[in-house]
């Protein structure tokens, strides 16, 4: 069943970079060269979530399979898959907004980007409330809620940045290109982290023990 995990893993990243790579890579290249501080911040976040993924792998290969078979694992084909499509679509709208913004076109793509992010948080809240286990049940449950919950916090922070961008562009008429670039780059980083979480916490575990 692991073949399904690898199919979903590579397919999800292929879809993400196919729809976003050409839209924003050329503008972010110069941004990376001129903003080392924010680059280091993103790298530190990568190491943080790397610790979460390392803990997950340690639990997977340290516990007996009966441990996971005793859990009612969450299906990856429900809200988790829907949330993945939401973030992919939100990221695409963010890229379209950025390209149009560079051409002095102020459209509503940023609104769609924000609304899809809010819907993601709402669905995540619903999933937590109807989950079959709690954060204090097992070690895997703690990693599951910590990883997805902290990612949800990053989504919330990213939405705050995007809402401020929307407000400053359409109402204040005064904004910094650096802040817009940081906000959108942070949003894409949140999307990539979710792809790892979705493939490891949902797909990998589900197909490994079902």
Task: List each language-model region with its residue ranges.
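Core, highly hydrophobic multi-pass alpha-helical transmembrane subunits of bioenergetic inner membranes
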Residues: 1-210
């Amino acid at each position: 069943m692991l073949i399904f995990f690898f199919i979903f893993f590579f397919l999800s990243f292929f879809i993400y970079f196919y729809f976003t790579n050409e839209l924003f890579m050329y503008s972010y290249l110069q941004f990376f060269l001129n903003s080392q501080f924010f680059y280091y911040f993103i790298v530190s976040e990568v190491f943080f979530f790397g610790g979460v993924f390392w803990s997950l792998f340690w639990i997977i290969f340290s516990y007996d399979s009966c441990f996971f078979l005793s859990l009612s694992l969450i299906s990856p084909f429900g809200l988790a898959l829907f949330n993945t499509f939401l973030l992919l679509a939100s990221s695409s709208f963010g890229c379209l907004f950025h390209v149009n913004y560079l051409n002095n076109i102020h459209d509503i793509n940023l609104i769609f980007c924000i609304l899809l992010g809010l819907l993601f948080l709402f669905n995540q809240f619903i999933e937590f409330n109807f989950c079959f286990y709690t954060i204090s049940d097992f070690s895997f449950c703690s990693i599951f809620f910590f990883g997805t919950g902290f990612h949800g916090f990053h989504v919330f922070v990213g939405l705050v940045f995007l809402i401020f961008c929307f407000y400053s562009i359409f109402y204040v008429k005064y904004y910094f290109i650096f802040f817009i670039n940081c906000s959108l780059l942070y949003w894409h980083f949140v999307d990539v982290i979710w792809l790892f979480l979705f493939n490891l916490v949902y797909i990998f575990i589900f197909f490994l023990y079902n």
